Amino acid sequence: MLALKEANLQDAQKEYEFVRAIPENENGFTNPDFGVSFEEFVSVSLPRMIEWSEGRNLPDGFVPETYLFLWEENEIIGQFRIRHHLCPSLIEGGGHIGYFIRKDLRNRGYGKKGLALTLEKARKIIPENEIYLRVQKDNPASLHVMLASGGYIHHEDAHHLYVRIPK
């Protein structure tokens, strides 16, 4: 059974192993913890994730952001992030939600299922009437996930499609 769990210290080893496998930037999903040691992950990265989800110690211009891991039994399948509200840089940037599914598990429905679970949580947090997402034009699989989740293409630029999902 799939479940979302917020980043936490109890699952640090498995969270670290998952985060360590995420590239520094893939399809617009950035990994600020790329290349960190386990010790740094536990002492810096995880506390930051937890603090940011609570709106504490945010850098200037950042909004609260909840880090969620998608689990199937004892295995992490993906990471989803909910930014709690929009700021100017998020409106034409990453929007409310970003996600990453493990490469070896893509095209198996985990993106759709994980986004559905994330949307349930996001609808309780986000004050805007629509949930904003952005996808690179060369990532049709992720666009398909967003559209299958009730999204529509709101607009585009040279490199991205901007998707909205009604709340």
Per-range role (PLM):
Residues 1-96, 156-167:
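GNAT-family acyltransferases
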Residues 3, 98, 132-134:
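Short aromatic/hydrophobic contact patches that present stacked aromatics
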Residues 12, 91, 108, 140-143:
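Loop/helix-junction capping segments adjacent to catalytic residues or to phosphate/diphosphate-binding pockets
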Residues 83, 108, 112-121, 125, ...:
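Extended, folded domain segments that form the structural surfaces/walls around functional sites
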Residues 83-85, 96-107, 136:
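A short, internal acetyl-CoA/4′-phosphopantetheine-binding micro-motif in the GNAT/acyltransferase core
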Residues 98-101, 107-121, 143-148:
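Conserved acetyl-CoA-binding loop-helix of GNAT-fold acetyltransferases
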Residues 122-134:
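Conserved GNAT acetyl-CoA-binding A-motif
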Residues 137-155:
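Conserved active-site alpha-helix within GNAT-family acetyltransferase domains
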